[in-house]
Amino acid sequence: MLRSGVMPNEVSFSSLLKDPLQFHLLQIHSLVTRLGYDGYDYVSSAIISSYASHEMVSDALAYGGLLDPDSCVVSMNVLAGVYNRVRMYEEVKKLLLHQGSNDTVSWSILITACAKNGDYAEAFKIFKRMRICGHHFDRYASVSLLSICTKSNSLVLGSSLHGLIIKTNSGCLDTYVHNILLDMYAKCGRIEDCLKAFKEMEGRNIISWTAVISGLALNGFSHKALAWFKAMEEDGFNPDNVAVTAVLSSCRHGGLVHEGMKIFRHMKSDYSLEPEMEHYICVVDMLCKCGYLKEAEVVIRDMPFQPSAVIWRTFLQGCQTYGVIDAQVFS
């Protein structure tokens, strides 16, 4: 381009900066500066993003700090995203809270920063300010706020937010957000609302099914969790490792030893899955709690890798509970 006498502009620079090699990035940045395109918001944001993607975080932050916040809204959002990535949450707030030209993305980044930093009340205050300023919230803000409700067991807030998402028709109630809702209702003890939200979903995936199965197990409905696991298979979803962990956990809590062992033993043949440590922990705990210590001993002995400290502790507690002292697994 340069050899033919055609000078790059903000569009070509933005395109060049999408995925450059590190050496090329430095050269492009130098050319951007020489040609005076530093002040173009999309070019500046692309430079910050490229530095961050090459793990040159200090360069990204240093460059972003030289820009005018009021004239580079997109760049400030990208810079705030980098601060979030390196857990400098207070810097995110300093950067965006006093900026007069925040957009929906800016507000969402602020809410995410507060959520990750444990400032739950502040996150909802910012959400309120966002709404007062007339900005619609997006899926990122929804996910952060619903996650706060889950962690703080705030069912009223979570349910209200769900209603607001539906009422405003914000377009953010996609499968991902719906899955967060399922998790929130389940962990807040409202399994009926979890099941209702699931039935209202259009784009269910394996995560949706797993959230319901985990929720049923968490709330003491082990038999229902097992039934939903079977329904998931009938609906055409092949269980993944997380889904199997969820159903094994439900069998553990409900004492469904026969059903749990059947799923565990057929993981490879039925689902093409190799049992992982988490599966062994569930199975050993299930067997030990129900007094099947010999069977637990066999499972531990046949493990293809070294048992974890959790497995040993679980097994020893089972031996102590049932007064068994002649386990051969140590020999």
Name what the model sees in each region.
Residues M1-I28, V32-S331:
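Alpha-helical hairpin repeat boundaries in alpha-solenoid proteins
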